[in-house]
């Protein structure tokens, strides 16, 4: 189930984001989290199954557009379709928006058929 990021999930969110190639350094990771926490057009969502948060997807909302900035799944839950489920849930949440990828999410989104 896709849920909106809340501050009490910060450590989990940072851990999941750290799997992204661009988020390896702590300072960069902290800057990214600050963007999501302070900019209304930056939205961060977590994927929860039962009581476990196992995935994260971050987007920038622009006029009629959703640009996927970050997508990551806990390594022990990969290759189970979690990433695709997160993208589908986002498309259900923003049905009238065009979805775009950035250079780091493009290959994955292409596999999802976007």
Which residues fall in each region the model found?
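Short amphipathic alpha-helix that is part of the acyltransferase structural core
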Residues: 1-28
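Short loop/turn motifs at secondary-structure junctions and domain boundaries
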Residues: 35-39
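Conserved beta-hairpin
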Residues: 41-55
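Conserved acetyl-CoA binding element of GNAT-fold acetyltransferases
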Residues: 65-75
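Conserved acetyl-CoA-binding loop-helix of GNAT-fold acetyltransferases
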Residues: 73, 79-92
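Conserved GNAT acetyl-CoA-binding A-motif
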Residues: 93-114
